[in-house]
Amino acid sequence: MMQHASPAPALTMMATQNVPPPPYQDSPQMTATAQPPSKAQAVHISAPSATASTPVPSAPIDPQAQLEADKRAVYRHPLFPLLTLLFEKCEQATQGSECITSASFDVDIENFVHQQEQEHKPFFSDDPELDNLMVKAIQVLRIHLLELEKVNELCKDFCNRYITCLKTKMHSDNLLRNDLGGPYSPNQPSINLHSQDLLQNSPNSMSGVSNNPQGIVVPASALQQGNIAMTTVNSQVVSGGALYQPVTMVTSQGQVVTQAIPQGAIQIQNTQVNLDLTSLLDNEDKKSKNKRGVLPKHATNIMRSWLFQHLMHPYPTEDEKRQIAAQTNLTLLQVNNWFINARRRILQPMLDASNPDPAPKAKKIKSQHRPTQRFWPNSIAAGVLQQQGGTPGTNPDGSINLDNLQSLSSDNATMAMQQAMMAAHDDSLDGTEEEDEDDMEEEEEEEEELEEEADELQTTNVSDLGLEHSDSLE
């Protein structure tokens, strides 16, 4: 009783000595800790010199007791119900397929604010540090709920697009179609139909069917009186709620078993299903492979027209090859091989027909108004014209009057064109690559002949004009 009679001197002595207040504890502990300071204060008043040399002993703080006190402070905070509600929403968003939207939490916040205002309850406590902790915790859970909503939307979008892709590429008719007759063909007796008596008499047969690693169990109720139609089976599977069962049917290990298996079931072999799916997925590759062989006529017409329009330089660039491939719906390799063969089978006979006598190496050309019948560079023709004085003299028939060149008559040109068209008509130019040793030898011989022609032209005083004849020859 004497200890509680004089609280004022004790508070004044604590204020002068700047002793920190004891931590928050329960009332029994506070009474127990409050007694030693009062005794110490009484000693301090009676003997001040003794207390100056010895410090005041502080009571040890139990970490477990401090943790429990902090927990009770969080539980008693006014914002704790809102924090609990948000935490439960985050758990619901991660447990089920239906994610809790952030808009619903906004409604919950409004309801919480109205309830606090109606009950005249505060939103914060006397501890600013604890208030800041609660607000930050609510913000973190709010951000977490938003991220869960985004992830759920992405998952739903991916599933919808994947299911749509499966429905378009794996049609039911293609899935069960078997041209050679498979184990699940309607005309084959290998369909294992389990009768009603067998299922009723042997309850273990159901587990044997469901655990069979060689097949996929499909409800027989989806079939219409024995007519196997995968469209009905597929619709039954989708309408049953298991949207991912078609994906499981593709695998060789997984099985699709409905929850309520009917009395009759049909068993489909996984190996045959995988075989049909593989052939279905490789259908596009087979179509592309079927293009090898005879090329379409419209494609050859487009490439032949380009060839005759560029007789001066019948070597398309990479961009021109891509453009021609896009127009003809062919591959770049087919276009490249066609031009390789065309230069040998179409243009080479034209050159041979224009030069019937192989003895003279120097070739004569016609006038400039027919450049499409030339298969030589412009620099050689320009050099010869400059040698004759800049203005070529023409004969009455229109040919250039040059002694060292042989004239290209219209009869020879017509004969060459006919021979080239007949060769092109007989051979379809299938685009297959024919890079053998004979082709390489022919190209080397053509290059040697062109080099010899250039040397002979240089001997006829054409070399002083600085001709560059190798830039346009390949």
From Swiss-Prot:
Superkingdom, taxonomy of origin: Eukaryota
Compositional bias of kind Acidic residues: 429-456
GO cellular component, one term: actin cytoskeleton
Keyword DNA-binding: yes
Recorded GO MF terms: actin filament binding; actin monomer binding; DNA binding; DNA-binding transcription factor activity, RNA polymerase II-specific; RNA polymerase II transcription regulatory region sequence-specific DNA binding; sequence-specific DNA binding
Domain MEIS N-terminal residue range list: 96-179
Region (Disordered): 1-42, 351-371, 385-405, 423-474
Record-linked Pfam families: Homeobox_KN, Meis_PKNOX_N
Main location: nucleus
Keywords: DNA-binding, Homeobox, Nucleus
PANTHER family cross-referenced by the UniProt entry: HOMEOBOX PROTEIN TRANSCRIPTION FACTORS (PTHR11850)
Protein name per the record: Homeobox protein PKNOX2
Gene name as annotated: Pknox2
